[in-house]
Regions:
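Compositionally biased, low-hydrophobicity segments enriched in charged and small polar residues
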Residues: 1-5, 62-82, 123-125
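Short cysteine-rich clusters marking metal-coordination/redox-active sites
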Residues: 3-8, 29-32
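Cys/His-rich microdomains that often coordinate metals
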Residues: 7-15, 36
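Long, charged low-complexity interaction segments
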Residues: 18-72, 140-155
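Short, cationic/aromatic linear interface patches
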Residues: 75-136
Length: 155
């Protein structure tokens, strides 16, 4: 099967069986579908919360430039837009998204939340194996002299 996403994230559009996701009779890579859905969420959020009179072509061109040309994660863009709306940042045009993603406070909050999320996942995934927690046992051979006798070669 071939990925039908216009901006496929892989060099070859071929989809291995384990990575194939079907939506509306179209085949996608898991990451491609996730990116497409995130971009749609960004468009919906912008339209509903920022401006209903936005020119969609301009909005999509700006989002595609950020995600595919600048290689900014679509999830980060969605997070940044939500944070900007929550803080009351004035967004007059889709081009403002370029500046929102560079906001120092938003970047720090994103890193803090990702670090907390990774820490939470690590705690959930770590299984306390009692045998791994026990100290290793060492055996000592008494065939050779110990202490200063071993250093000086004496018996």
């Amino acid at each position: 099967m071939q990925c039908t996403y216009k901006h496929c994230l892989y060099q070859t559009r071929d989809i291995p069986d384990y990575d194939d996701v079907v939506k509306n009779k179209r085949h996608y890579h898991k990451r491609c579908l996730e990116t497409a859905e995130t971009i749609q969420a960004i468009v919906d959020l912008y339209y509903n919360e920022v401006s209903k009179t936005v020119v969609m072509k301009t909005l999509l061109a700006t989002i595609n430039n950020i995600v595919f040309v600048k290689q900014i994660d679509a999830k980060y863009l969605l997070f940044a837009l939500k944070m900007a709306i929550q803080k009351g940042t004035v967004i007059k045009a889709p081009y403002s998204l370029q500046y929102i993603i560079d906001d120092y406070a938003i970047k720090n909050e994103w890193q803090r939340r990702n670090a907390a999320k990774l820490g939470r996942e690590a705690r959930e995934n770590s299984v306390a194996d009692e045998s791994a927690l026990q100290a290793p046992k060492f055996k000592r051979s008494t065939g050779k002299p110990e202490g200063f006798d071993a250093i000086f070669g004496g018996q």
